[in-house]
Amino acid sequence: EAIDESSSARRIVVNAEKKAKTYGEILTSEDLTFTISDSEKEKLLPGDTVDSLGLTLKATTIVQEDILSGSTTDEDGDDILGAYGNAGKYVILKDNASNSNYDVVVRPAFLNVSQKEAEIEWNAAAQYTYTGNACGIEANVKADSLLENDSCEIKRLLNAQRTEVGSYKALAIGLTNANYIFSGMRRVCVWKYEILPADPEVTFPTVEVTYGDSLRKAVRTGQSGNGVFRFADNTAMLTVAENQSEQEMIFTPFNPNYKTVTSSVPVTVLPRKLTIRPDRMEKEYGQTITEYTWSISDGSLAGDDQLEDLKINVTLTAGN
């Protein structure tokens, strides 16, 4: 019995082309294309072209069993053609071939739908002043960077609750909607900030120093502040002529969260106390003593001062 070869559909193999989309971009049938080799084109009947195959493709979710069986539908029996698909990888398969004269086999390719970039808005400053409390740094996803009806939040915000003085990086990590990624295709968004020392509560002292003593021996009164007071130059020795001169004093708080501050402090110079004693002297009756000598019995001279610098005269007030 003769066989009518025209009743047997001709088998033609084509290759689906891989494609890439971003989440939110519409996928149309025109986006899904294929290639056919010259050897396969030769199998076309006279007068037919590639368009004569009436071939359309579809993109569907990847299920291993579907690929092996050649199914052209997803798990629910639907495809995503013309709809928003979640970010991920899809397989491009045969949808329909309207020309029954051909048995069209489509070698599948992948459609990669990449995540859409979401913009982050920081409610934060670059610098803060120490208060002992967290700075209140927040990070949110800009609503206008999302598709309509989509919602997306930051999964975790780390290192934003610092309270001590220092330089830090707040980290926004991950997004609750897997279809989105931080701008720049990053997994983490960073905000750099620093907490600066605060002004301390301090009252600088009243200072007195005895003539000839260095500021190291100065007496301070009336100071307040949880820290250390010191002169910028505590070796300075002031003279009476410099009474009430301004000297730079530095206050360093014990708590490093507060600033070290300086102030010009007036210094009162007090006279140096000395006790002198006239030397014992004897004379014969009728003899005149023109100069009486003396010595320091209590106290000492300052620096390079000499006895004659004191310009003290001792006189006899009674006796012959």
Task: Cite the ranges covered by each PLM segment.
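Solvent-exposed beta-strand/loop surfaces, strongest in extracytoplasmic domains of secreted
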Residues: 1-320
